[in-house]
Amino acid sequence: MDLIEHTYTIQWVGPMDYEEYREYLRNQETLDSAYFNLYYFEARKDARYKWSTYIGIHKNNDGIDRRVNPSHEHLGPFIKEDAKDIKIWIGSFANEKDQKPENVDIVETLFIKAYNDRLTNNTKKKESIPSSSVCVINSYYNTNDEPILRKSEKPMVFDDVLIYLEESDSFMHGNLSKMNGTK
C-alpha cells in the first residue's frame, strides 16, 4: 500500500464567463481573490469549434485577476474575440495553511499529468509527475456558494477525486456518484 503524503481539498467556483468572473471578484461577499491559486477554463469561439481547455496556477497571493485576464496567452484571445463559450473556474485550497507555492505546484502537476490528453493547451508540464504521492478532492460551487452536485455542471475534464501514487507511479480517479447532505 502506498503512503499518500499530501491530501488537499480544492474548492472550485464556476462556471463563469469573463464578465461574471470579474463581477464575482469585485463582490464584497466573495472570498478575497488572493486565496485563489488555481484556474481552469474551457473556451471556444462558438459551437462550430472544438473546446480549448487549460489549467493554470498563480502562486503569488496577490489576486488571481493578475493572471486570469485578457493578457493571458491562452485565455486572452477568447476574451478579445468575444468568444460565445467561455467557462472559467477558479480554485482555492480549502485549508489556507495549504496555500503554499510548493503545494500549488504539486496540485497543478497532478492535474496536467492525469488529464494531459484532455487539456488541449497545457504543453510544458505534460511529462512531469508530482514530486510525491498526493490526493486531491475537488468540490464545486456556483457563484452563490451553493454546492454543485450534477456532473453536467462541473468542469468537463475533472473528476471529484484524483490520486497519484509515487511508489507505483500510478493514478486513480473517479467521481462521487451520490453525495447527500443533512441539516
Where does each model-flagged region fall?
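Boundary/linker segments flanking structured domains
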Residues: 1-53, 57-183
